[in-house]
Structures are given as C-alpha cells and as structure tokens.
Amino acid sequence: MSMELFEVHEGKAKVLVPKAKTIYDSPVFYNPRMAPNRDVVVLLLNVLKPKIVLDALSATGIRGIRFALETPA
C-alpha cells in the first residue's frame, strides 16, 4: 500500500505526513491548527528548562521532535 506524502515544516522539524481530505481521514493524525500551540510550548520549555518532558499524546510525534530539536538537552 503506497501513500502520497507531503513534507510539513514546523519550527526546526520536518516530517512526512500522508495526504488526506481531512485530518481525520489520515492513518496518522497531524493537526496543523495546533502549530501555534506547539510554538508556545517550545518557547515555554526554553524558559523553564525542565529536566524531563513527556509527550503522552503523540500521534505524528511532531511535538516531541520539536522538543528534541528546539530545546536544550
């Protein structure tokens, strides 16, 4: 089974997401409307500098990928 993919650029992250008519039709859930929320969380993590962060509701994993790329180790 082949899927048509498109590349999403968000912050420093680049991920491939299946094309779908709606976000609910895709086998992988990616909600582009939440990008501003992820931007704010990355900014907050850079200010608070927690030692551990959990992305418990991961779908595409973009939030966790951004945490890894855009916050201090």
Swiss-Prot record:
Record EC number: 2.1.1.216
Annotated S-S bridges: none
PROSITE patterns tied to this protein: SAM_MT_TRM1
Keywords: Methyltransferase, RNA-binding, S-adenosyl-L-methionine, Transferase, tRNA processing, tRNA-binding
Catalysed conversion reaction: guanosine(26) in tRNA + 2 S-adenosyl-L-methionine = N(2)-dimethylguanosine(26) in tRNA + 2 S-adenosyl-L-homocysteine + 2 H(+)
GO MF assignments: tRNA (guanine(26)-N2)-dimethyltransferase activity; tRNA binding
Domain of life: Archaea
Trm1 methyltransferase domain residues: 6-73
Any one Gene Ontology BP term: tRNA N2-guanine methylation
Family classification: Belongs to the class I-like SAM-binding methyltransferase superfamily. Trm1 family.
Protein's job: Dimethylates a single guanine residue at position 26 of a number of tRNAs using S-adenosyl-L-methionine as donor of the methyl groups.
The protein's name in its UniProt record: tRNA (guanine(26)-N(2))-dimethyltransferase
